Regions:
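Ligand/cofactor pocket segment of small-molecule handling proteins
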Residues: 33
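A detector for short metal-coordination/catalytic motifs
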Residues: 18, 22, 29-30, 40-43, ...
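A short mid-domain helix/strand-loop element embedded in enzyme catalytic domains
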Residues: 1-25, 36-45
Length: 135
């Protein structure tokens, strides 16, 4: 069991979780499923530009987010998958194809118009640039 150091740490965690709900709600205004697998049942709100590198407004900006299944979310956070400027899924050269096929299940080629806007494309450009050695 983890104990919090002080009330400031507790308040920070509560505010972060509160912001996460708002963040996911903003993403849900643009999409309702994983943009890779099409799953609606098990999706997570994923920051494109990670929380740790985002300023306060970017942390809750729904355009800095996409819905992904847990497997896709983990791969995206590690820079093992991303999306090109046309919304197509791209796989890292560091990710074995057999592992990719098992984890992704299948790229259903979901309509990516929800990410094809200037704001989200800029965040995706940041993601590709910061993981450029992977692609």
């Amino acid at each position: 069991k983890r104990y919090l150091k002080d009330s400031l740490e507790y308040e920070t965690i509560i505010k972060a979780r509160h912001g996460q709900g708002f963040f996911k709600d903003e993403i849900l205004k643009r999409m309702d499923r994983c943009i890779v697998t099409g799953s609606k049942e098990i999706v997570e709100a994923c920051h494109i530009k990670p929380w740790v590198f985002s300023n306060d407004s970017e942390k809750i900006d729904g355009y800095n987010g996409i819905l992904l299944t847990p497997n896709c979310h983990k791969l995206f956070d590690k820079g093992l998958i991303s999306f090109d400027p046309n919304g197509h899924l791209i796989k890292s050269k560091k990710l074995d194809s057999k592992v990719f096929n098992k984890l992704i299940i299948e790229d259903k080629n979901i309509d990516k118009t929800s990410i094809l806007n200037d704001k989200t494309l800029n965040y995706l450009k940041w993601h590709r640039k910061n993981f450029k050695s992977n692609f």
